[in-house]
Amino acid sequence: MAQSDFLYPQNPRRRQEVNRLHQQLLDCLSDSFQVTNKLTGVLNTHLGCRLAFIEMKSDGTIKENCDIIIQAMTKIQKELQKIDEALKDQLEPTLYRKLQDIKERETEKIAIVQKVISVILGEATSAASAVAVKLVGSSVTTGIISKLVSVLAHIGTSLLGSIGVAVLSLGIDMIIQAILGAVERTQLQAAIKSYEKHLEEFKAASAKYHHAITEVATAVKRQLR
């Protein structure tokens, strides 16, 4: 037991809590990498994009890994915006507005996109139309992805940002040392509060993102049957 633990008997418990929260944060980060790569694969395959897959930087900091995901998502948003603009140019205004109408049936939207998708992509597939309907101008890009980008940016600039993602494998003391070194001996309570605050936001945003991209993948499978 460290000497300070005699003065602060709750410190061992706090160390364990930091360890647990750190692992949860890494799990969320890992999931975001996987889901982003799944989305990248769908866009490359069905919308003709040439987006690069991303990989978690095991020797990097939490901020560096957040930035990798943010950069990938920003590129995805730009690609979807290009397709959205192309749809707007090719479709009659009334038809384009139907794509934005949440009350409009998805099958009707796919039929609308199917009319012009070959002009935009050079080929027309129902899978491409389904992906476009699910992602272009939808709440996925305007809300869910933007929210996750915002959450990741906040995590990156927080006191957690400078902590390495690999410190977990080095033991609890290394995590604590990394935290204390990063924030000049800020108490463990502050670290725990920061983890809890950001994890609450991250888990919520990540879950919505995961669900949305799973829906896109499911829609593609339906069209390929």
From Swiss-Prot:
Keyword Transmembrane helix: yes
Pfam families tied to this protein: DUF4533
Localisation per UniProt entry: Membrane
Membrane topology (UniProt): Single-pass membrane protein
GO cellular component annotations of the record: membrane
InterPro entries assigned: DUF4533, SMCO3
Superkingdom to which the source organism belongs: Eukaryota
Keywords, alphabetical: Coiled coil, Membrane, Transmembrane, Transmembrane helix
TM segment ranges: 155-175
Chain coiled-coil ranges: 69-92, 182-209
Descriptive protein name: Single-pass membrane and coiled-coil domain-containing protein 3
Organism: Mus musculus
